[in-house]
């Protein structure tokens, strides 16, 4: 069963991003200031930062960051900076201290229109806060447990690579969005728009509130992959051993999990789901072609009573709800398996179909109302 996603902050691992990187203790108000625009007030940065920079930039440039600590990127205040031609950087530390501050490079290359924030030695417990033009492209590398949060940015390209740190994307729009992590979680809050690639290794989990775009490709290894809403033209979601739990999905969707279970609360479009050992549980709200296969698990198919479809269900056992109004139902037993075919609501065999195959498990089919599919608590 797909549960409601908890608030973003509660899903961040302990020791990872805290309070959107803004809750760390900062230094005194006499912080050192550097940069090409010393007369700028630096409004919007953390108060009492250990060090601050304000640089004048092109509003359509690129931010490149390589850090072992926490990083937060958000857009400039459009009222304070209507031209969008500044980058503001602030460093906060724990208990007024951040080791390795002198190793931090903050520079802008006007020819390449690239803003660089680089360090391999800054205190991993520090946090770097960046206010950038809203259209800035992003290329971020985080090492160790350094986490990344990007919010309210609209860009052509957003690339984030982390090791053990959490990646949070909140209300991001990008033509090309790529997130890769070796051991950190990935959390998408609000609506994330674009062509999206997310790859999470080891036990990393991917939690999504809403994705909207043309093409989405998401994979995990041992971790849970869950999404509340997917509105895409085509999506490919896979996991080696983790479960895949989806809420409302629209478009052409392919789901694969070798060891985990697959759950879809509501499918509108073409759906292909397969698992080797896991179970598959799907509610088909509006039919495209549906193909469900599990080698060793069972399959549960649910649909509203109004759905027009031709179905073919094959398994060691097949159970069709007595309340389902099925016409021309036929049963064929061969060996250890059984196949049941039928039509719903005067559909024809040439219309869109549901095909479910579970050679070692049970295939069940039942009517369920849209309200029941919401799985609201009693």
Curated annotation (Swiss-Prot):
It comes from the Eukaryota. The gene is Fam185a. Pfam families: DUF4097. This is Protein FAM185A.
